[in-house]
Amino acid sequence: MHRASSKHTNAKKEAISTSKIRDNNVRVTRSRAKALGVSNSPSKPAFKHETKRVARPSNKRMASDNITVCNQKRRAVLKDVTNTLAESIISTEGNVKACKRGGKETKQIEEDGLVDVDGEKSKLAEDLSKIRMVESLDASASKQKLVDCAEEDRSDVTDCVQIVDIDSGVQDPQFCSLYAASIYDSINVAELEQRPSTSYMVQVQRDIDPTMRGILIDWLVEVSEEYKLVSDTLYLTVNLIDRFMSHNYIEKQKLQLLGITCMLIASKYEEISAPRLEEFCFITDNTYTRLEVLSMEIKVLNSLHFRLSVPTTKTFLRRFIRAAQASDKVPLIEMEYLANYFAELTLTEYTFLRFLPSLIAASAVFLARWTLDQSNHPWNQTLQHYTRYETSALKNTVLAMEELQLNTSGSTLIAIHTKYNQQKFKRVATLTSPERVNTLFSR
């Protein structure tokens, strides 16, 4: 009972002390309350911090003061420096009036860097009037120019309509119809860069003459027929021979070795299944050994810097024949054979080196169309567009080619004539025109 009464007394004291502390606005924790409750001495009130209340001004006065301070600290907003001059010119009059309203005297300052407004305005007005006058003159001149061009270019527009697109609708991916125009742009440049010399017989060679060169190529035509090589191989062979002899002296005894070596290289490049080296040695009746051919092959390739991808007459002839047949209702196979025949006739002639391969190909198509049909002009807008040659540019080449066509009977170089006199080529070597082609250029 004594313990219960003591506990009751302590709880009562603790409650009283806690209430006193709350009255004194002191934060009480449990430990502090317990400590105060255990001690029998009366608890001292905690020190109360007295905070002086600062007198606040009225809201109205504060707002007016803020406005005054803001007006004192307010500055002009930064602007784009490049607009300063223009804005100063435009707002000069307004600023002068505003200054007068403020009661301040202003004076006009004429210093360096300031613009005379009246002078600038008059100058701008003069410039604007000049510009408008020039624009009106240009507009009238352009209208007159359009009228003149429309009258002068009616024939050109008609010609453009007559050009047949030979690349559209081609399904064979090997024709590269999407890139054909760009490809032949590059080929036209390449034929100028990789062209053999036209005077190497005089400047470089001493034992070789044009006749010996013609005999070698005529024999290589027979070799290509013996091994059934494509015509691209024959054209590349002749190109390699001429390019090598343009910079290297060759003895007469090594001329045939050079011929079979160049055909071996061309066969490796163009043929699917090229003849073996031993076959080329055999075709010369074993005049040259295998080691001699290999040695010459290395010499030729090093001299040409291994540049074997060159445009030949056959490269252009393939495309020009397609352009010639595009305007025909029924393409004539005889025209293709005849153009190939004329082009191959030029291989044996040293004098044709002065003509570009593209020019020889275009002339072959021209002469072939004339030989088969004298009722129509052999050249049209489509051929002129794709060959890039006008009729006048073909004159010398066509006339020289016609001489080869008419004088084959008296020539000793008959391999090409014999080749195209076969039935598989429609015997086009026997075809001639009743009217000479020079009549076309004299009209």
UniProtKB/Swiss-Prot annotation:
Protein family membership: Belongs to the cyclin family. Cyclin AB subfamily.
Protein function: May negatively regulate endocycles and act as a regulator of ploidy levels in endoreduplication.
Bias (Basic residues) ranges: 1-10
Keyword annotations: Cell cycle, Cell division, Cyclin
Designated name of the protein: Cyclin-A2-1
Family annotation (SUPFAM superfamilies): Cyclin-like
GO MF term set: cyclin-dependent protein serine/threonine kinase regulator activity
Tissue specificity field: Expressed in tissues with active cell division: apical root and shoot meristems, lateral root and leaf primordia, floral meristems and developing pollen.
Domain of life the protein comes from: Eukaryota
Organism encoding this protein: Arabidopsis thaliana
InterPro entries: Cyclin, Cyclin-like_dom, Cyclin-like_sf, Cyclin_A/B-like, Cyclin_C-dom, Cyclin_N, Cyclins_cyclin-box
Region named Disordered: 1-61
Keyword Cell cycle tagged: yes
A single GO BP: cell division
Keyword Cell cycle attributed: yes
Pfam short name (any one): Cyclin_C
Biased composition annotated in UniProt, kind: Basic and acidic residues: 11-25
Induction pattern: By auxin in the roots, cytokinin in the shoot apex and sucrose in suspension cell culture. Down-regulated by salt stress in root meristem and shoot apex.
